Amino acid sequence: LTIARKAGIPVTSRGAGTSVAGNAIGPGLVIDFSRHMNKILDINPEARTARVQPGVIMADLQVACAPFGLWFGPDPSTKNRATLGGMIGNNACGPHALTYGRTSDNTVSLDVIDGRGRRFTAGRDLDQVPGLTDLVSTHLSLLRTELGRFTRQESGYSLEHLLPEKGSDLAKALVGSEGTCVTVVEATVTLKPLPTRPVLVVLGYPTMVAAASDVVNLLPVEPLALEGMDSRLVDVVRRAVGTVPELPGGDGWLFCEVGEDEGDPRSAVERAADLVAASACVDHRVVEDASEAAALWRIRADGVGLAGRTPAGNQAWPGWEDAAVPPANLGPYLTDFEALMAKYGIEGLPYGHFGDGCVHVRMDVPLSEEGDIPVFKAFMEEAAALVGRYGGSISGEHGDGRARGALLPHMY
């Protein structure tokens, strides 16, 4: 880093390269932390923390923590290869972020090197960076009203964590900055107790929009995960693997996982009953058996991979694959987003972390001809404007990267 700074060479930090928005590529020097800085330095079961280097693979940390009955809550689908450094860069999460939060919510401190070559520990203190306290005091109103409006406001910088009522937490503010502010060389993260005896509740609805519109009624029950999909994704999985487990009646579904929490007397089965009672579903299925639940979750897992092609067999691309809106706006947003895809003749398979308002989709945008690129750009601009109208975030999970950075004016 010293040599790169003196020579004026740009530096890009890279983990496993699992991001899909061009987050880990750039000119100059690309540092692959997975090669040499990949060690778990300490696990403290009493404090429920782990100290790691940025190249540690997420799944390896989970294996190391399991004997203590602990785990790192954010669990992206790429956890068997994604690194903690990459997760810090993108503020990664996953289906259980509804309960355990994003990477920023589970970060205690970061050992970093900034652009001037200063190495320091970023935590709950703004004094490490000259001028940071003045920046916050000068822009208090802006930070309070524009940032941190809902849990998946991933796009841009998370400077709301610098506010005094947020603990003046520089570490959390740096999470999600995609390596543009500092280089992380070590991180201390929070660990949580492993969930015990989870129960899966599958709720059936007439449409996916109806399922999405019911999310706000289910959140008070505090499910561990709340995922949404419809028959299009299920049909793709069925055609690929031959069969899928029986689902409740309907054309759209919510997969809800409930468990037992410390200090809460309710059992997972009682929580499941509460969830069904709170819903507006037309049918439901409560699954206590772990193997049956795993088979149902497999629909979601297989669908993620198979969504790379549409039912017609066309290549489906990322680029606009993880926008998010406040959960209360999810149903209307999905209606308008489907209409926008239809306007451009685009086919896709929406699904996602509906409990957080995050929608994943890959679309069969034509990109083989020279004239296709302006059409795709026009779609992206309209999609970003749509998210902005619903108070959402251009990215709810994967970060902005090169794919979406230019769209930020639709939000800010």
Language-model features and meaning:
Residues 163-167, 171-378, 384-386, 390-393, ...:
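C-terminal substrate-recognition/cap domain of FAD-linked oxidoreductases
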Residues 411-412:
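Cyclic nucleotide signaling catalytic output domains
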Residues 120-167:
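Phosphate/pyrophosphate- and phosphate-bearing ligand-binding catalytic cores of soluble enzymes
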Residues 1-11, 29, 33-76, 88, ...:
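N-terminal glycine-rich flavin-associated loop
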Residues 13, 22-25, 32, 40-45, ...:
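Solvent-exposed alpha-helices and their adjacent loops that cap or buttress functional pockets
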Residues 80-85, 233, 237:
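Beta-rich nucleic-acid/ligand-interaction surfaces
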